[in-house]
Amino acid sequence: MEPSSWSGSESPAENMERMSDSADKPIDNDAEGVWSPDIEQSFQEALAIYPPCGRRKIILSDEGKMYGRNELIARYIKLRTGKTRTRKQVSSHIQVLARRKSRDFHSKLKDQTAKDKALQHMAAMSSAQIVSATAIHNKLGLPGIPRPTFPGAPGFWPGMIQTGQPGSSQDVKPFVQQAYPIQPAVTAPIPGFEPASAPAPSVPAWQGRSIGTTKLRLVEFSAFLEQQRDPDSYNKHLFVHIGHANHSYSDPLLESVDIRQIYDKFPEKKGGLKELFGKGPQNAFFLVKFWADLNCNIQDDAGAFYGVTSQYESSENMTVTCSTKVCSFGKQVVEKVETEYARFENGRFVYRINRSPMCEYMINFIHKLKHLPEKYMMNSVLENFTILLVVTNRDTQETLLCMACVFEVSNSEHGAQHHIYRLVKD
């Protein structure tokens, strides 16, 4: 990676001045029952994150450990709610829901031929596949299992869980109120029914479900604070994080937001969001809503390191330029440009920008944000704070990926969260 530097003028001080079902009986001593609303919410989120995998194990990239699906669901419930559910309890609940879902299909299908066909497909599916499958529901136009919402703060967008790794960074879209008009993902109708184990399409599952195109894909992105507790240990806190995810064809496609809704939040001059989108390719543009985790102790000491790590991959060998523009009230405040060369790993070209130092402006901005007494004050400041990330092919100047990032402060119990949208212009 070539040396890089931040350039900008406005100080953060100046900027801050401007800116469940009752039939399911409990089987342990939990007063709310085994599948209370918060546990059911986490259970449904985990179903969306971890696709059915039969007897195979899922490897968590952050840990390198192998887990069965039910283990991961139980683990996720523990992380989200603090309540312990065993993998056997998870398995039992999946079977209960599968039977209920089968009855639901059966009762709503009036045509006997369609009913027989649906039952034939479901007979070949496991309980996990029936509970996780969305294809049959979508094609029949049947409602899915209702999911309770987070008790949210104003300004959160409506929506569902997306893929991500459980832990300190959840890929969740907290919901209540809608900031921009959201367009649901549209898929072409397919006649008949398909079991969850149907042959995979020729395109990879991540396309249309994550940040990426056929030329370049974002694998991971994080902004973090690393503090040295003692000579032998470091504490790492993630402000924002997009983790590596194992996408499934049953995962929903990304929703769309009209790019004109956010033009005023980003620079309009040469190289701004509007000009870039006009040049295209338009499938390379994404909006990321981050709920930043500021629930950490920030100390002014020499042992603190503020950094950003990102990783991309491609089937092509390129030299890429990564531009990060920090914006306030739609105006660029500071920009960092980095050049990265490809490394061939496991049959693909990898571009990794590791532990890139944050600029002084961002560090001071985080400090001042933390000193605000109320969360609504922080969110008020963040309404006028955005970041534009643009990855370009250095030789052809083609835009490979563009991520327009907007921010709110996460509820401390939820940790860092995010949700991804496609940017379109209808």
From Swiss-Prot:
The modification Phosphoserine is found at residue 11. Gene3D superfamilies: 2.70.50.80, TEA/ATTS domain. GO terms for molecular function: DNA binding; DNA-binding transcription activator activity, RNA polymerase II-specific; DNA-binding transcription factor activity; DNA-binding transcription factor activity, RNA polymerase II-specific; RNA polymerase II cis-regulatory region sequence-specific DNA binding; sequence-specific double-stranded DNA binding. Residues 1-31 are annotated as: Disordered. Residues 167-426 are annotated as: Transcriptional activation. Changing residue 108 to R: Nearly abolished lactylation. Residues 1-12 have a biased composition (Polar residues). Preferentially expressed in skeletal muscle. Lower levels in pancreas, placenta, and heart. Its main location: nucleus. The modification N6-lactoyllysine is found at residue 108. Keywords: Acetylation, Activator, Disease variant, DNA-binding, Nucleus, Phosphoprotein, Transcription, Transcription regulation. The keyword Cell wall biogenesis/degradation does not apply. Lactylation by AARS1 promotes nuclear localization and stabilization of YAP1, leading to increased Hippo signaling pathway. Delactylated by SIRT1. InterPro entries: TEA/ATTS_dom, TEA/ATTS_sf, TEC1_TEAD_TF, TEF_metazoa, YBD. It comes from the Eukaryota. It is found in: Nucleus. Transcription factor which plays a key role in the Hippo signaling pathway, a pathway involved in organ size control and tumor suppression by restricting proliferation and promoting apoptosis. The core of this pathway is composed of a kinase cascade wherein MST1/MST2, in complex with its regulatory protein SAV1, phosphorylates and activates LATS1/2 in complex with its regulatory protein MOB1, which in turn phosphorylates and inactivates YAP1 oncoprotein and WWTR1/TAZ. Interacts with YAP1 and WWTR1/TAZ. This is Transcriptional enhancer factor TEF-1. It comes from Homo sapiens (Human). The lineage of its organism: Eukaryota, Metazoa, Chordata, Craniata, Vertebrata. The gene is TEAD1.
